[in-house]
């Protein structure tokens, strides 16, 4: 898994564009391979999510994928996570298949429950507080102390913002 800058990653946000990358051997450049993405399950019953294709170039395959939210409700910890957060976070992996041969599974990509907000009018808002409020009434307050606000452990879903 790589980000758009080519850095290896193990975590991403829903909506991030990531690259699925793998070294390949004994496959000619230009050959098309299928990359199968799964949502990992503790019990080994992984859920098929999507397949994308890419061409082998210089002994590597690379394909772009947009991280999506898939409910992970069949792990042993799913119920606990649902009770604590109100949702579950998926973990993804992929395999590459070409000419009838399937690769080993990739490392895992964990979906993070955070957002990064850019404060365009920071000079006006510095020192104030941003309050996020979700449909169920839960909320989180964040001090506006930077032009980039990284907010972790948030709920998935729409929220409205108040500045006070």
Region locations from a protein language model:
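Short, compositionally biased P/S/T/A/G/V-rich stretches that sit at domain boundaries
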Residues: 1-14
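Structural beta-strand segments of beta-rich domains
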Residues: 16-20, 113-117
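Structural motif
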Residues: 24-27, 115-129
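Short amphipathic beta-strand segments in non-cytosolic proteins
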Residues: 37-49, 131-141
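Short, acidic Ser/Thr/Gly-rich low-complexity loop/linker segments typical of extracellular
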Residues: 52-56, 138-150
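Short, hydrophobic beta-strand segments
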Residues: 56, 61-88, 151-155
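Short beta-strand elements
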Residues: 99-115
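Short Pro-Gly-centered beta-turn/loop motif in secreted/extracellular proteins
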Residues: 148-164
């Amino acid at each position: 898994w790589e980000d758009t800058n080519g850095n290896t990653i193990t975590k991403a946000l829903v909506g991030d564009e990531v690259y699925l990358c793998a070294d390949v051997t004994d496959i000619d450049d230009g050959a098309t391979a299928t990359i199968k993405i799964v949502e990992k399950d503790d019990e080994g019953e992984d859920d098929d999510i999507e397949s994308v294709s890419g061409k082998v170039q210089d002994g590597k395959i690379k394909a772009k994928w947009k991280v999506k939210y898939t409910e992970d409700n069949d792990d042993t910890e799913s119920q606990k996570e649902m009770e604590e957060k109100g949702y579950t976070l998926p973990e993804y992996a992929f395999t590459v298949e070409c000419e009838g041969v399937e690769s080993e599974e990739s490392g895992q990509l964990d979906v993070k429950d955070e957002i990064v907000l850019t404060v365009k009018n920071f000079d006006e808002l510095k020192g104030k507080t941003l309050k996020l409020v979700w449909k169920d009434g839960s909320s989180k307050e964040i001090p506006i102390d930077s032009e980039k606000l990284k907010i972790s452990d948030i709920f998935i879903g729409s929220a409205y913002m108040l500045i006070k």
